Regions:
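Canonical tetratricopeptide repeat
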Residues: 83-84, 127-128, 151, 185, ...
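Helix-start (N-cap) detector for alpha-helical repeat units in TPR-like alpha-solenoids
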Residues: 44, 78-79, 123, 146, ...
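Eukaryotic alpha-helical solenoid repeat scaffolds
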Residues: 238, 252-422
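Alpha-helical linker/edge segments of TPR/alpha-solenoid repeat scaffolds
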Residues: 90-101, 131-146, 257-283
Length: 422
């Protein structure tokens, strides 16, 4: 449960945590590791089994030396490399010296790089690769007392001492009732002990502290999966995505849930043709833009499938690169792509499609346009944009939209992103 800083978020989430009920280093080893080890090497296999069992029990420090010996014998074992990376990160949490912790975190990431090079692209390896290359770590709190309590809890957890970890996390929460990670980690420990009701209470507590952090939802989803409460688990995994959709790790829980339900996560195939490029300003300060028109849009009138309506989407963007953006965002000095701009363009397309349908000028509506119209009619157009078509500019508009329309984002993910794999 080691704190780390993802490159894409400020959240102080933890990496050293329970084995996932949805898929992990352990399950990967159990499924495929022995295929990769030379047949007849019982000693290697048995020691690998032992390391797995210790890991299952949360005894990371006991598993690490075994993994190190296995690595010395077979440096290319991708699963052993993953286990060593995870174990090394756990060991870092037990160290009181910040410089020593940094060195171990650097080592942990390097081992993850080696694991990936050896062919291991598991979710855990991808997560370990998000560790900062310089080994830096965020603090849990500006309060020295809270920080010390959290570090103590992390060290105890990494050593498999859950009782001491609980005591330290509780102390941190008493000192700071808004300490998200303390509530989160208390739920995590409860989950490991099979205390599901208590785990749920702690995860809910963390969510109440900060509903815009994804981890408590995702951990709670894992806990519900372990209980066989799959429908409720899906709800939590979706809420995790709503909280922080632009982190790779956020989608992990929902993706694994979907896979087990023979479903996939896939955005609607709606890709407007044409493009517009912002070329800055000329000598007089006037905006310069290049509009690229996909000529197939103009020729599509003969198809009578409505695809010529995409023409207005491209044209709508030209005004946004000029005065329209300044009018809508008077406090922003430089142009950026925005949710409002995308909404304007898509709504113009939808309006034109509906007008043509009314006039019976469309014989067979293009599937992408049919989906766009349906999404618009369901009031999910903005959710489609922020989830399926985000960029740096649109991401800036997400918090305000999320705070007002969580239900719409949940609906969009449930009805449009989760699709049957058949």
């Amino acid at each position: 449960m080691l704190a780390f800083e993802s490159t894409s978020t400020r959240n102080k989430d933890s990496l050293i945590r329970r084995k996932s009920t949805q898929g992990s280093f352990l399950s990967l080893i159990l499924l495929i590791s022995f295929v990769q080890v030379a047949k007849g090497d019982d000693s290697y296999d048995e020691r690998k089994k032992q390391a797995i069992e210790l890991y299952r029990q949360g005894k990371y420090m006991d598993a690490l030396p075994i993994l190190e010996k296995l690595h010395a014998e077979n440096p290319k074992d991708a699963q052993v490399l993953e286990g060593m990376s995870f174990g090394t990160l756990a060991h870092a949490a037990t160290l009181s010296d910040p410089a020593a912790r940094r060195e171990e975190r650097i080592k942990a990431r390097k081992l993850a790089v080696e694991a990936q090079a050896a062919g291991n692209n598991s979710n855990m390896v991808k997560t370990l690769l998000e560790l900062p290359e310089d080994g830096s770590e965020p603090s849990f709190s500006n309060s020295p007392e809270v920080e010390a309590a959290m570090r103590e809890g992390e060290a105890a957890f990494a050593k498999g001492d859950s009782e001491s970890a609980v005591a330290a996390y509780n102390r941190a929460l008493v000192l700071d009732p808004k300490q998200y990670s303390a509530a989160l980690f208390l739920g995590d420990v409860s989950f490991k002990k099979g205390e599901h009701a208590q785990a749920g209470e702690w995860f809910l507590k963390a969510i109440q502290i900060d509903p815009n952090r994804e981890t408590a939802y995702r951990y709670w989803g894992d806990d519900l999966v372990a209980q066989g409460r799959l429908s409720e688990a899906k709800e939590q995994f979706i809420k995790a995505v709503v909280a922080e959709p632009y982190r790779r790790i956020t989608w992990m829980g929902l993706s694994q849930w979907a896979q087990k339900q023979k479903m996939v996560l896939k955005s609607p195939a709606i890709n407007p043709p044409g493009k517009i490029e912002d070329k800055g300003k000329d000598e007089k300060g006037h905006s310069q833009t290049n509009i690229t028109i996909d000529m197939s849009m103009l020729n599509s009138k003969d198809k009578k499938d409505g695809t010529d309506c995409w023409f207005v989407y491209t044209l709508s963007k030209a005004v946004w690169h000029g005065e329209r953006f300044q009018k809508e965002f008077p406090n922003e000095k430089e142009y950026r792509h925005s949710l409002a701009e995308e909404m304007d363009g898509f709504q113009m397309v939808v309006s034109q499609v509906k007008e043509k349908l009314k006039k019976k000028e469309i014989k067979q509506l293009d599937p992408a346009l049919a989906s766009l119209v349906k999404i618009s009619d369901e009031g999910l157009l903005e959710s489609f944009i922020v989830i399926s078509r985000p960029d740096e500019g649109i991401i800036k508009d997400y918090p305000a939209y999320r705070d007002l329309h969580r239900d719409k984002i949940v609906q969009y993910i449930s009805e449009w992103i989760l699709q049957s794999a058949q």
